[in-house]
Each structure stands twice: as structure tokens, then as C-alpha cells.
Amino acid sequence: MAGHSQFKNIMHRKGRQDAVRSKLFSKLAREITVAAKMGLPDPNMNARLRAAILAARAENMPKDNIERAIKKASGADMENYDEIRYEGYGPGGVAVIVEALTDNRNRTASEVRSYFTKSGGNLAETGAVSFMFDRLGAIEFDAAKVNADDLLEAAIEAGADDVNSSEETHEVVCAVESLAEVQKALEAKFGEPRKAGLVWRPQNTIAVDDETGEKLMRLVETLEDNDDVQNVTANFELSEALMAKLSA
């Protein structure tokens, strides 16, 4: 499993214990507002907004918060956010992609650079590591509600490339340009997915020792804790022992 997915699994469990929902809701709301401003405020006519709302629902964000974020897009006091992708190397030479929505490019760049430097890594130029990743569409369904074999058959028929299953979820993977069509076909058969959107997926992962793994997890956690950072993806793989330790 790639470091990014492992990190998400670990933080999902920790998040419930630490009750750090307000920061997460703030990031989800920002994406909803930006998506609504860039297109129509109707999720049925705006794929990015629909994806943002699905992500918010998956984290149990209150409906009022979601509606408020959509309405904010039409307000005169709506801040202007820039979408920026940072790329760099973390401890052990691991490739890291950071996606941000910021109202101050200089501030965010300075903060992200300092995180990389303090971790023993370095921030590089855009394009420095993204060639090591594939940009894909991903649609996630609850494993308890959707049969894996039925989903695989329907997904391939709809034009998807593969389905990755775990105990909790089934993830349908497809080409970026096929996402809307595949999602529509699967929703008609299985109902609304937990999540749907574009992801970065490492072509290969690097197995790191536990010391390096802990340093990388601290870097990713620090990046995720920044208000402007929306997503962090990396190409490392942790040992099962370290995963268990970090999840405890």
C-alpha cells in the first residue's frame, strides 16, 4: 500500500480520537466553495462540486455546512484562491506531491518549503516528481453495501480499468477523461459512491525503514495540518509493524 493511503488510514483512526474535525471541515468547505465558483452551483451540472460534496459527506460534514460553503461562492466577500501543486523529495528520497488552495502564494510556498527542509528533504520545481505518478479517476464504494464481483463486472463494462478492494471499500480506477461516464453508470446501478474524483497514484513505491518512515509520516502530517494544503501524495511504503504502531 502506498504511503499516502497508509497515512489516510492511520489519520482516519486517529482523527476520531483527537476530534480534529473543524480543520478538516474547513478544508472541505474551501474546496466546495472554489468548485461552486468555478462552475455552476448545482452538483448535477458541476462534476468537481459533486466530488467535493461527496468527500464532505464521507467525513460526515453537516448538510448546513455544505450548503453554506456553496452559497459563499456567490458572495461579494468570497476570497480568491489559487490552485497550486508543489513537488519535492522527503526523507529517503521519497517523491511527494502537495496540492493546495491558497489566498497567498508566497505564504504557502514559504511554509511548504520549510516543512520539506526541516524534514531533511527539499522542495523542487513543478514537474520534478509528478512523472513518477499517474493521474487517474477514482470512485469509492462501501464494501459492506456493494458486492465486489458485481462492481468489477459493471465497472469494466462502463469503461473502468480496475477495481481495488479492501475490507472497508472498493475503489474503481479509470482514466481521467472517463471519470464522469463511469461514475454515472455505476451510480445508476449501485447508488451514490462514498467518494469520486481525481487522484495521483504512484507508479512504483519505495519500501522505507521504520526510522525513515516515521520521518516521512511527520512530514506528511505537518503538511496535512496546514490550512492551505488539500492533498498530499507520496510514493513510499511502510512496514506493517510501523503502521500498527502509528495507528495505536
From Swiss-Prot:
Keyword Cytoplasm: yes
Chief location category: cytoplasm
Protein keywords: Cytoplasm, DNA-binding, Transcription, Transcription regulation
Highest classification ranks of the organism: Bacteria, Pseudomonadati, Pseudomonadota, Alphaproteobacteria, Hyphomicrobiales
Homology family: Belongs to the TACO1 family.
GO molecular function list: DNA binding
Biological process per Gene Ontology, one example term: regulation of DNA-templated transcription
Protein name (database record): Probable transcriptional regulatory protein AZC_0510
Subcellular location: Cytoplasm
Pfam family, one: TACO1_YebC_N
GO cellular component, one term: cytosol
